[in-house]
Structure formats: C-alpha cells, structure tokens
Design a protein with these regions (language model features):
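Metallocofactor- and cofactor-centric catalytic cores in central/energy metabolism, strongly enriched
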Residues: 2-329
Length: 329
C-alpha cells in the first residue's frame, strides 16, 4: 500500500467518525486540519471546546450590542470581561467547563447592562454561531480565524498589563470593533485590512505591557540563573504573569519557602524589583511542553499563571494551582 493510499484511507476513516468539536487554533492540531473528536491535541475536552465557541460567540454578540448602542469607546470596566474572555480561549489556558460557563454569564450580564442603558433589546444579541466562521468560504474563514486568533493572543498581553494598572483605549476599542466585523462582513479586503491592523495594535499592546512591566519592576538586567534546587520547601511558578509571581514572593518573604520560575516565567529573574526577594532562587526545568515529565513526583506546589497548562498527570495533580483565567477542574 502506498503512502498516498494510506493517507486516503486515514482521511476517509476520520471523516466517517462523528465530530464532537472543531478547533484548529494551534500548530499541533490533529492531522494539521483540526481537532474534531472527543479531545483535542492539547488535552481540551470537546465539551470545553464547544463552550469556548459559545463564549467567543457571546463576545461577538457583546461587540454587536456595544456597536448598535452607539458606544464608540467602551470604558476599562466594560473592556475587562472582553479581554478576559478572549484570553480564556487561548490554547492551554482553561480546561474547566464551569469556569467558561461563568465567563459566558458575565458577558451576558454586560449585554443586559448595555442594552438597558442604551435602549437596545438584549434578546437581539444571542451568541453568534461560530459555525458561520468555521464553514465559511476558504479565504473568508482563513482571514476571520487569523484575526480571531490574533485578538486572543493580544488579549493575553492586554490582560497582564491591566493587572499592573495599564490600559489602552486603542487596544480596547479594537477588540470590540474587530469582533463586530467578524459578524458583519465577509469581504476579504475588509478582513485583510483588519488582520493587518491587528498586527499594528498588537505592537502597541506589547509596548504597553513592556512599559507596565519595566515601570513596576525595573528594566531587566543580564542575570545568571541558578538551575539547582536547594533543600527545603519551595514553590514553582510557571507562565508569564509577573504580578502573580510578585504576590507569591510577597507572601513567602521571611517564611523559609523558596520560589523557582519555570518555562516562560524565566525572564522574571532579570527584573530588579523581583530580584530583591532573596527566596527567588532560580529556574526549575525547561520549556512548558516538558512539564508532564519534569513535574512528575515533584515535592512542591506548581502555580500556572497563563497559557502554559497541560492536563496534569496523577503524580502531581494534587499540587496544581491556577490563577485568574487559567483553570483546570
């Protein structure tokens, strides 16, 4: 049997199986085309994937409601649930169905609030059907997906900046406008313009986060990082939310508990304000994708702060802690 025949049979078999979800957000997606069965390549269950589609559709409904109400620049309070909802849908952030349902409820409350204040009917804003994106013309689907995934990535930066007290009206406005346009247009040129604009706005968002980080913790300096684990109790913090790490350091000051970064938290060791805490000892392990092997039987709690969570193995499942939008049931 040739490789081509094997691939044809594999695809026919795949097409014959019932599809329980659709997600092609990450480069590890099944067969390079999309995860469609009970569990995604990332470990996300189909129920969670479908709820995240509902959450995204509800965020689009929120954007439509704000647009129709004539609100051109939503305030920071109105924008935060939008940012948190987008952040929740990034790969490796949320595996908890109840947490997604709670976010959907918060967005519905925002729709009710806006409609009540501005004379529009909340009933006119059900969750947008994401199948209209996934099943659209190939070019339209590609552009809308690229825009949506870009918005989700930008939401992570915006959320971390917000936790440090920084926000940008330009960034916040673009979340609403871009999501509205996903539901309002199928014109490829309009969508391409929005994709390019997303890149420009994302650059501004990254600059905002960098300014928030450096103004709070100082400019990073060249730092030698210790990779050994000292005897005694310790905590591992992974992800890239510096505010969460700072809170853990403040709560462990003088308590004889050491703190180690992991994965994307490694750069935190270069910030002068964080280096002032002597219990921030160094880095444990390597990259986030190695966590299931590296955390096996680890005698310490691990705190996930951003999009780096993989379904935990039994050997350390009782030591998993998450913050903010990150959640595991």
């Amino acid at each position: 049997m040739t490789a081509q025949e094997t691939e044809r049979i594999r695809r026919e078999l795949a097409d014959s199986l019932p599809h329980e979800m659709f997600c092609f957000q990450c480069e590890q997606t099944a067969a390079g085309t999309g995860c469609v069965w009970r569990q995604g390549a990332c470990g996300k269950r189909s129920s969670t994937a479908n709820l995240e589609d509902e959450l995204t559709g509800t965020l689009i409904a929120y954007a439509r409601c704000v647009h129709d109400a004539g609100v051109t620049s939503p305030c920071a309070h109105a924008s935060l649930p939008m940012i948190e909802g987008m952040f929740c849908c990034i790969t490796n952030v949320c595996f908890d169905d109840d947490a997604v349902r709670a976010l959907i409820g918060r967005i519905r409350e925002r729709i009710d609030h806006v409609s009540g204040r501005h004379g529009v009917d909340a009933a006119d804003y059900p969750a947008y059907d994401m199948n209209l994106v996934w099943n659209a013309d190939e070019d339209v689907r590609s552009l809308k997906s690229l825009l949506l995934f870009g918005l989700r990535g930008m939401a992570a930066y915006a959320y971390h900046a917000r936790m440090l007290g920084a926000d940008s009206q330009t960034v916040d406005d673009f979340f609403f406008r871009a999501l509205y346009e996903i539901s309002a247009t199928d014109d490829p040129q309009t969508l391409l313009g929005l994709v390019l604009e997303c890149g420009r706005v994302n650059l501004e968002c990254m600059a905002m986060l960098d300014e928030a980080n450096t103004s709070t913790y100082g400019d990073p300096v060249p730092t030698t990082v210790d990779l050994t684990i000292e005897p005694g109790p310790f905590i591992v913090v992974t992800g890239h939310d510096l505010a969460d790490l700072e809170q853990i350091l403040e709560q462990t000051d003088g308590r004889g508990v050491n703190v180690y970064t992991h994965g994307e938290m490694l750069p935190a060791l270069a910030y002068p304000r964080l280096k002032e805490h002597p219990q921030l000892k160094g880095n444990f392990g390597t990259a986030w994708q190695n966590q299931q092997r590296e955390f096996k039987d680890i005698p310490a709690p691990i705190v996930w702060t951003t999009n780096c969570l993989m379904p935990p193995k039994d050997s350390y499942a009782d030591r998993v802690f998450t913050t903010e939008a990150v959640a595991y049931p």
